[in-house]
From Swiss-Prot:
Family to which this protein belongs: In the N-terminal section; belongs to the bacterial solute-binding protein 3 family. In the C-terminal section; belongs to the transglycosylase Slt family.
Gene from which this protein is expressed: mltF
Region Non-LT domain, residue ranges: 22-268
Compartment(s): Cell outer membrane
Reactions this protein catalyses: Exolytic cleavage of the (1->4)-beta-glycosidic linkage between N-acetylmuramic acid (MurNAc) and N-acetylglucosamine (GlcNAc) residues in peptidoglycan, from either the reducing or the non-reducing ends of the peptidoglycan chains, with concomitant formation of a 1,6-anhydrobond in the MurNAc residue
Domain of life: Bacteria
PROSITE patterns: TRANSGLYCOSYLASE
Name of the featured protein: Membrane-bound lytic murein transglycosylase F
Region named LT domain: 269-486
Length: 486
């Protein structure tokens, strides 16, 4: 998975030109009520989607996801309320569109020519490749000719179109089946669990799921990069499309689209099986000893984020000591510990409390111009590198015409702090900026793993409890001296 190759300037220019070209076809100019008028009259933008960590998910009733946030911003742009309509599979999405039960589909859908008979597409907002996956430990196929097992893909997915084309053009013996009951995410999970031989997925979703299911392995790329886009109803009315183009153009111009892409996709590129497997094992075997302390002292920080910071620092080893003298779960220096009132750096609770306080102080110290949802990454860079060096990275960003308040811009300048071409001109001099870059990226990856892994455990526990409850109804416990029918 990589970012769209086109420059954001090009996207914005194309959006503007298309909007101008569509101007004559906007219905309100002819006295008709168009799609956009209907949405505004209703006061709601109905968006159909599919549950997935990347697309749309909820934790404690708080929604998140790339498509969700983008749709929420579009609804705000239109001045209406966002109504999310989750569906289980892609066929249901397009049926809802056909039946006028939704206004647009925002579900990480790959651009597909076959779908153009049923729907229109909006602008692309990121790109992915289609990949064939298998379970690690099984023989790795190098092409479709090497497959020795069953291939199943989600019904209605772009993967079906791809497989049909490959069968017609290159692999006449290729066979597969489609599943109506299982979503693409569920099929990927089945491969990871050894319940299915192969399936196809998009590179972004696979990269995220590997953080939770490290046994999920990529055999090969099936396609080149393809755009991901929204879909909406076919119509001669261009009002909604024109509004969408204006919205995307604005998102590109102010950098919001790049920041959103960074938030959900900027840290998922590299995958280390051993590191991920080791971390998931530590969640089961080590984290329970300290979880209550992370929850107790997290304050305004998500306890899970505080926990993964500690893992990045010490691998949850309270006795950890570095060659430079930092110690404990949160790897505090003596000077920092003294300033926080931490008397014993290897005491787990003192270390966690001190680290949480220090991080919150850094967040409050940051310039107010930094967006709320990006402040934590700047604070973590300062936690690792030092506040002054983080400010140097912001200055470098501004001097190079980047946005010093955007993490996606600043993180790319962190490695420059160790390069002779740049650090002599900084206020605080040389710093291992590349280490701070990796530090923050690792924490973000661990956070994806921890949040997703705990959600999976909760889901399985709930399913197990439901099964137990059902079995209890079927086989009621009979006390001594009682019989069924008494």
């Amino acid at each position: 998975m990589t970012r769209i190759k086109l420059s954001y300037f090009t996207i914005g220019l194309v959006a503007l030109l298309l909007a101008l070209a569509l101007w004559p076809n906007i219905p309100w100019r002819n006295g008709q009520e168009g799609q956009l008028d209907q949405i505004k009259a209703r006061g709601e933008l109905r968006v159909s989607t599919i549950s997935s960590p990347l697309i749309y998910s909820t934790e404690k009733d708080t929604p998140s996801g790339f498509d969700y946030e983008l749709a929420k911003r579009f609804a705000d742009y239109l001045g209406v309320k966002l109504v999310i309509i989750p569906h289980h599979n892609i066929d249901d999405l397009f049926d809802a569109l056909d039946n006028d039960d939704t206004d647009l589909l925002a579900a990480g859908l790959i651009y597909n020519r076959e779908r153009l008979n049923r729907a229109r597409t909006g602008p692309a907002y990121y790109s992915v490749s289609q990949q064939l996956v298998y379970r690690l430990g099984s023989p790795r196929p190098k092409s479709f000719s090497d497959l020795k097992g069953q291939v199943v893909v989600a019904s209605g997915s772009a993967h079906m179109t791809t497989l049909k084309r490959l069968k017609q053009t290159k692999y006449p013996e290729l066979n597969w089946s489609s599943s109506v009951d299982k979503s693409g995410k569920e099929l990927l999970e089945q491969v990871a669990e050894g319940k299915l031989d192969y399936t196809l997925g998009d590179s972004a979703t696979i990269a995220l799921l590997q953080r939770i299911h490290p046994q999920l392995a990529v055999a090969f790329d099936v396609t080149d990069e393809e755009p991901v886009t929204w879909y909406f109803k076919q119509s001669d009315d261009d009002s909604l499309y024109a509004a969408m183009l204006d919205f995307y153009s604005e998102m590109v111009e102010d950098g919001s689209l790049a920041r959103l892409e960074e938030k959900y996709l900027g840290h998922v590129g590299s995958f280390d099986y051993v590191d991920t497997k080791t971390f998931l094992s530590a969640i089961d075997n080590v984290l329970p000893s300290y979880q209550h302390l992370f929850e107790k002292h997290a304050g305004d920080i998500d306890w899970k984020l505080l926990a993964v910071i500690a893992y990045q620092e010490s691998h949850w080893n309270p006795q950890a000591t570095s060659p430079t003298g930092v110690r404990g779960l949160m790897m505090l220096t003596r000077v920092t510990a003294d300033g926080l009132g931490v008397k014993d750096r290897v005491d787990p609770e003192e270390s966690i409390r001190g680290g949480a306080i220090y991080l919150q102080r850094l967040m409050k110290k940051l310039p107010e111009t930094i967006p709320e949802d990006e402040r934590i990454w700047f604070a973590l860079a300062a936690y690792n590198l030092g506040y002054g060096h983080m400010l140097d990275a912001r200055r470098l960003t501004k001097n190079q015409n980047g946005n010093p308040d955007s993490w996606v811009d600043v993180k790319m300048r962190l490695p420059m702090l160790s390069q002779k071409r740049y650090y002599p001109s900084t206020t605080y001099g040389y710093a291992r900026g590349h280490e701070a870059y990796n530090y923050v990226e690792n924490i973000r990856r661990y956070q994806v793993s921890l949040v997703g892994y705990l959600q999976e455990k909760e889901k399985k526990a709930a399913q197990h409890a439901a099964i137990e409850a059902e079995l209890g109804k079927s086989n009621p416990v009979v006390g001594p001296g009682w019989s069924i029918g008494d």
